[in-house]
Amino acid sequence: MILTGAASTFPIVARVLNAMNRRMYAATTLSSAKSISAESLNLRSDSNSEAAHGASESETRVSLRKKRIKQDDLEPVKKCSARETKARKDMCGLPDIEDSPYKKTNGTASSRTRKLNSYIKSTEASPSASSIKTAGLGIPPENWEKVLEGIRKMKPSEEAPVNAVECDRTGSFLPPKERRFYVLIGTLLSSQTKEHITGAAVERLHQNGLLTPEAIDKADESTIKELIYPVGFYTRKATNVKKVAKICLMEYDGDIPRTLEELLSLPGVGPKIAHLVLHVAWNDVQGICVDTHVHRICNRLGWVSKPGTKQKTSSPEETRVALQQWLPKGEWVAINFLLVGFGQTICTPLRPHCGTCSITEICPSAFKETPSTSSKLKKSIKSKKL
């Protein structure tokens, strides 16, 4: 029952996993449910999925976000063009999964090793990142405990969308091994996708018996792509899901990796997803799960900054590293749930509701974010027309 408490702490995963509870409980026994899943797996195996890869390329082009650069490009070469040199300079560590589309990867052991080595080197090169696993070494900001207590008293999570679904029994009826794979796939699909869309996609996979590594490995990639549509970057995610299933079968006997380094080596898995899966699936807390809400609020509160400067952190991963330097480890799990709810209801991305917030007196960003001049002008023009 590892997931019972853990999943309720991470509402995104809990919401995704809970979407399938009603249908999963309808089965009379677990063995009969497995037999039904096995019968529905009569899908034709297809080793050539290049067409799906082609489709993913065109989809990625329409994104206005910065693409991930292949880790292969990070390897030093003797000679390179001016364009290649510029691309190398623009590359800065591992992008967060929330902020960029999936990068194409061949999923081989060598490519995954290069990906992990690159992450480790970037971690060792940064003075702030070198103390990732050590809590409480940094100087905590003033009044941080008072701020957290004020947010808790506002109880933002009770009104937040992430808490709309009951989470206390999420996934607890599955055998541990199946539950862990279930968590991994659901989390992979959830990035850059609303919870209800992810939940529906996972449910469709379950209806077709495609929530085990064996089933996904045998299924056509096109079938997976159709079932998970319209999650964000569904074509690329279908490719990654197939690769992850193969790796779990070949290297982990159908289970999922249980260390941070091994999870980071999987296609489509960045620091945020790795820490989230590690905690929910294995009940192992090695880092803070930082999404866009936590990233935004920590910068507004002045809790994090770039190493040696007062500049805001530029990515959730930078925020995670900076936050872990001073936040006590006992708060690492709770901080995500608390700030996500706060960010969805009060400290919103655009025009935060400072008027209803109880910590404005100690918040350095209170009432400083106002509508832009252009938006005010549009409102003025609209009112004149009326």
From Swiss-Prot:
It is found in: Plastid, Chloroplast stroma, Chloroplast nucleoid. The record marks 291 as: Important for catalytic activity. The active site is at 272 (nucleophile). Its EC number is 3.2.2.-, 4.2.99.18. PROSITE patterns: ENDONUCLEASE_III_2. The keyword Chloroplast applies. It holds the Pfam family HhH-GPD. Keywords: 4Fe-4S, Chloroplast, DNA damage, DNA repair, Glycosidase, Hydrolase, Iron, Iron-sulfur, Lyase, Metal-binding, Plastid, Transit peptide. It catalyses: 2'-deoxyribonucleotide-(2'-deoxyribose 5'-phosphate)-2'-deoxyribonucleotide-DNA = a 3'-end 2'-deoxyribonucleotide-(2,3-dehydro-2,3-deoxyribose 5'-phosphate)-DNA + a 5'-end 5'-phospho-2'-deoxyribonucleoside-DNA + H(+). Residues 1-50 form a transit peptide. [4Fe-4S] cluster binds at residues 347, 354, 357, 363. Residues 252-278 form the HhH domain. Residues 44-66 are annotated as: Disordered. It comes from the Eukaryota. Its main location: plastid. This is Endonuclease III homolog 2, chloroplastic.
